Amino acid sequence: MMDDFITVTDVVENTFCEKFTYFSLVLGLKQYEEKRGVVISGKDLHIKHEKTNKTYLPLNIEGKKIIGMKFFSKRLSLSGKIDEAIETDDEVILIERKYTDYTDIGNTIKVQLGLLSILINENLKKPVNTTIVIFSKKHTIKKIVPIDQEILNFALNRLEYTKNIFLSCLNPTQQYSNKCINCCYRKICPVGSLYTGL
């Protein structure tokens, strides 16, 4: 049993690149997010909506608004914080905000939505059947993402893979891709540094 909780963010980062887990959780290297403009802008967006949108309910959904709540699962050794959610009589609708104009629902978002849905279900004893992802940068676009068993299974598999790297302390193999260019670990990563020239 792990002494520490893996966070949803840890698993999302593992989905983005498996070496992230090795550098951040095994070696304990900081990401220095305070030096990354997009990350700072994204956090500012979350803080803004936590403070100013306390009663706003999107798509005319009636229910109790939940903002910035952190959940834990001792069973999964997992923790995660939600941006916003609306609790109705029989379900919870999760709302995630993204500071980007890239509106594809990729694997990292699916993992995040899946794991947060599991945490909500365990803690509030209500299912998450629907999530709303709000993309905000130049434009605001809302996408509704149903939470099905495929997303939940995919998210749980990525969680187990993240734990395995953490527990084994093994550096996973990874192929170079365009995402290496903006990776915070590119200067020390044997894959990213060879191609970025840094």
Where are these regions (language model features)?
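Short, histidine-centered active-site or binding-site loop motifs used for metal coordination
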Residues: 97-101, 135-138
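Short histidine-centered catalytic/ligand-binding loop motif
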Residues: 98-106, 145-149
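Short, charged, amphipathic alpha-helix that recurs within catalytic cores of restriction-modification
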Residues: 108-120
